[in-house]
Amino acid sequence: AYAKSLSFFFMKVSIVNIGNELLAGKTLNTNSHWIGGKVSSIGCKIESQITVKDEQNSIVSGLSYCLKNKPQYLLVTGGLGPTDDDLTRNVLFKFMKTESTFDYEYWKSLRSKYKQLDKKISDSVKSQALVPQIGEVIANPNGSARGLKFVKNDTIIFVLPGVPFEMKDMFLQSIEPHIIKNMKDPIFSKILRTTGITESFVYDSIRYWNHNKNKIGYYPSVYGVDIKVSNRN
C-alpha cells in the first residue's frame, strides 16, 4: 500500500446540470463527473448532484432542492447559449429577483470578434450581453457565454456554460481559486491503495481506526481497494 494524495475536506458543494440532452442520454454528462472530481480533490464534500430539464419549473425546482441542504457553493452548468431553449440565464434572474442591464461594451467586443472571424453575428447572441443588477458576470476566455455569480442566503451560486472546455477553463480560473481562498478549518485526507486483498479483509484489519477522530472510506475496484482516511489533525 502507498499514500498517493493529500488534500483538504470542508466545504459543502451541490451541483445542478441543466439539459434535455443529458436526461435523454444523447450527451454524456462529463461535466458532472469532472466537477465532482475537482471539488472533491480540493477538499469539498459533494452534498447533492442532480440533472434537470431545460424548463423553468424544473430549473427552479432543482435550485430550490439543492439550496435546502445549505451548501456553501452551488455550481450550475448549461443553458447559457443564445437559442430559445437556453433558459438558464433568465430563470436565474427571476429566481434571484434581479433585473438585468445590457452590456453595450461587451456586445461591441462580441461583434468585433465575429467580424474578425468573418462571421455574421445573430441578434439572438445579444442575450449573452445581459448582466444582472444584483450579481456578477464571470469571464469566458473561450466563448461568448459569460458565467454568473450570485449569493443567496449563505450560498454562493456559480453558473457556467455547458460546453465542457469552456466550463473547465472558467472553473479553474475563477471558481477553484475562490473556493480555496474561502476554506476554513480544513480536514486532511490521505488515500492508501492496496492490491491483492478484499474489501472485507481491509475493513476487518483497520476498522478500529474508524473512531470519532477519523472518517474512513472504502473504494473497491478491479485493481484493489483504495482507503481514504480523513482527519482534522
Which residue ranges define each predicted feature?
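Glycine-rich phosphate/diphosphate-binding loop of Rossmann-like nucleotide-binding domains
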Residues: 12-50, 54
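Glycine-rich beta-strand-to-loop/alpha-helix junction loops that act as flexible
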Residues: 18-20, 76-84, 161, 232
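Short acidic loop-to-helix transition motifs that present clustered carboxylates
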Residues: 51-59, 199
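Proline/glycine-rich low-complexity loops and linkers
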Residues: 58-61, 86-182
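Short, well-structured alpha-helical segments in soluble
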Residues: 61-69
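Glycine-rich phosphate-binding loop
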Residues: 69-96
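Accessory alpha-helical/coil subdomains and C-terminal extensions
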Residues: 151-232
